[in-house]
Amino acid sequence: MASKKIRTRFAPSPTGYMHVGNLRTALYAYLIAKHEAGDFILRIEDTDQERLVDGAVDIIYNTLKLTGLNHDEGPDVGGNVGPYVQSERKAIYLEYAKNLVEKGEAYYCFCSKDRLDMLKENAEALKRPFKYDKHCLHLTKEEIEANLAKGLPYVIRQNNPTTGSTTFDDVIYGKITVDNSELEDMILIKSDGLPTYNFANVVDDHLMGITHIVRGNEYLSSSPKYNRLYEAFGWDIPVYVHCPPIMKDTHNKLSKRNGDASFEDLMKKGYLKDAVLNYIALLGWNPGTNEEIFNLEELTQKFDFKDISKSPAIFDDAKLKWMNGEYIRKLSLDEFHELAVPEYKKVLKKDFDLKFISELLHTRCELLSDLAEQIDFLEELPEYSTDLYVHKKMKSTVESSLENLQKVLPIIEEIDEANWNKDYIHEKVFELIKSLEIKNGQMLWPIRTALSGKSFTPGGAFELAILLGKEESISRLKKGIELLK
């Protein structure tokens, strides 16, 4: 018998920005499908109407498009098993919930908010988790019909057993058994007629033919209840792939509620989309080699969901920044320059050779948003301490710096504008270094410091002189001499 075509889904709630954890779920679902030439479906889960955020659906579309995680079916591209927006499927869920009621697998609950609040307070007083007491399970058919006729608000709850156990399999975590006494009678249909997330995703996953479900391990505890729904309907249970949490550090989960970076934030900080996607792929998955740089096509070929780890993944900003630098260096100079110019223009108003700046920074840049800070001294010399002139490796001191700047200044002043180029300046300065019988760094470090007022610069002394021009270079050398006196 031929195996079923792999079908995965990304089913986000449009409640704001695309969080890193959500993007990883989308990526893993995409890779599982595409590794086996399957289908990747986008479904919008908007049943929690109070949490919806205007524009959030567009963020989902834009992020998937930008990262290349193109879906085969979805609200914007259509498909054979739509609608792909849960709020447009309201009648479907109610029909299936009523079917469960008829089977005795679910029941109407008319309990008031006051009664439910009382149950919660009692549970808190006893320091036990809240669990509905099945009060409405025992209503007769006549009582239920009378309540419905009166128009009393109701929810439909799952009827879970209180004895025995339920076992389910997860690709990552293995076989898990839960005592049925721990299962709550979760709400399937809310009082507004919309399904809960828990119910809608089971119905939709079945009707849309989803074979593999990728989600965070926080849903492990709900999986026995999902399984009981599948079994109650007589449906095949899909393959579960529960992913480990992404941690900010060893104690705290990465969370959009705590203001941790969303995909949009990372883009604004100057990260490249391909670097972010590559890094996120490695948050919980290991290719089994030391190789770490993969484009989306390479990830699709190599990804095996069975290699996803149980262990929490730490979101390491330094590692992401390193990886981003690797991707920046893979860009052509023209590609890098195009991305860098908007950053330069944030701080540079005067006329500079921007392409030359890009040539200097291309191999040194790790983050586009760092560029402005690395070149702002070109526009205006910052105030700086004479401590910058002290450099042990360069054998440079405050005293030697003053002496060497005073000796190089007339050499610089004598260079004609026509000869103001790197090779000629280099030749003249090195003639002086040779005649003084000093180390190169003893001359070059103070020149660089005087021209920039910074410990890090995009180029050395000669590159800075070319960028600044003769007049500005001489002015800054004189300021350095005055500061050192």
From Swiss-Prot:
User: What is the role of the protein in this entry?
Assistant: Catalyzes the attachment of glutamate to tRNA(Glu) in a two-step reaction: glutamate is first activated by ATP to form Glu-AMP and then transferred to the acceptor end of tRNA(Glu).
User: CDD domains annotated for this entry?
Assistant: GluRS_core
Please tell me where ATP binds in this chain: 256
Q: Which organism is it from?
A: Clostridium botulinum (strain Alaska E43 / Type E3)
* Oligomeric form and interacting partners: Monomer.
Q: What is its main location?
A: cytoplasm
Can you name a GO cellular component term?
cytoplasm
- Segments carrying motif 'KMSKS' region: 253-257
Q: Could you tell me which NCBIfam families the record lists for this protein? A: gltX_bact
- Record protein name field: Glutamate--tRNA ligase
Its taxonomic path starts at:
Bacteria, Bacillati, Bacillota, Clostridia, Eubacteriales
Reaction(s) this enzyme catalyzes, per UniProt = tRNA(Glu) + L-glutamate + ATP = L-glutamyl-tRNA(Glu) + AMP + diphosphate
Q: Does the keyword ATP-binding apply?
A: yes
Q: What S-S linkages are listed for this chain?
A: none
